[in-house]
Amino acid sequence: MAGRWQRTPNEAGAREIVRALYGDVKDVEWIPSDDADVFRVTFTSGRRARVLKLGISGNPAVWREVGAFPAMRSMGVREVLEFEYTSEDLPGSEYDFHVTAELTPPPRANQAMARMWADDRPRAVELARWFGDCTRRVEGLDWRSVPRANSPERTIEMATRWWRPHYDNLVARPDCPRWVREFVDRVREHIRRPPTSFGGWGGELLRAQDGSFLLIDWPSLGAAPPCSQAATALEVLLRFGAADPTPLVEAFVDGWAPGGLDDRHLQDLRLTWVHSILGWAGMSLTFDDPDADLGPAYAAARHDLGEDDPAAWLRRAAGNP
């Protein structure tokens, strides 16, 4: 998207923080990121590298994580970052920040998933089941018990403000089908309803030294529409690169909804899944090309609206309908 990462990272602030915390800093290297200034910190002593995530003006993502992650871990969602230091350890600092041990970054974590499917499919299936179980635990959190989590009112405000211009661009296109306009009306009504679940994860993963995965990038952490966390996690299964994702989807559902996928969950999951397809199409009009060919997005959305098997949604998304 145009304008991404064009800000100047706050390297001076980063160096000030890490030198206050460590006496053996060797270097501070910026890692491009959307919602914060992220830096890799290395040391002259040879200790393991650290990652500093530093808040940027106008974006409370780091402030929210500092408050929320310890509470989420204490409530059974241990798949979020564990902090070594936060801004609470430097009361005089003007910045919101947290410091963690360096873990395997998202591109390599994604590659590990693809290798796992190629080399050890039973383990990949178990990982998909873990994704489902983790999703169930996240969605079961009460936003009121998670410090700094977005309230239902805040979630509605953010979703409405974000999606309105993109869907306005979509339905303004002369080639926008009637069924898409009707679906957009459903989405607009859906995001105006008080959210009854918890979520806000953006889909990024890190991999720990023991091979486990951690969920990072929570741009809208807090109260969330039903099944929105599940739809994001389901899409992550595409990173296994399976031509037929059926066993992965079955394992995911088994972890997420052990009693089976009832009609209410299916309808909410499908609405969020198709909302992602058409919402991204609208975003492409806003940020990239207002004359973009939306035929493939329309075809995918139409297919998934008429299909009750989530594995079929993933097959089509992977190019294997």
Which residues does each predicted region cover?
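Helical subdomain adjoining the active site within ATP-dependent kinase catalytic cores
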Residues: 265, 282-321
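A conserved alpha-helical element in kinase catalytic cores
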Residues: 50-96, 116-130
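Juxta-kinase regulatory segment immediately upstream of eukaryotic protein kinase catalytic domains
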Residues: 1-28
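Short pocket-lining segment of the protein kinase catalytic domain that shapes the ATP-binding cleft
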Residues: 69, 98-107
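Active-site activation/catalytic loop segments of kinase-like enzymes and analogous catalytic loops
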Residues: 227-261, 274-292, 300
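Active-site acidic catalytic loop and adjacent metal/ATP-binding pocket
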Residues: 34-47, 184-228
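Conserved kinase catalytic-core helix
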Residues: 109-148
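Active-site catalytic-loop/activation-segment of kinase and kinase-like phosphoryl-transfer enzymes
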Residues: 136-137, 147-190
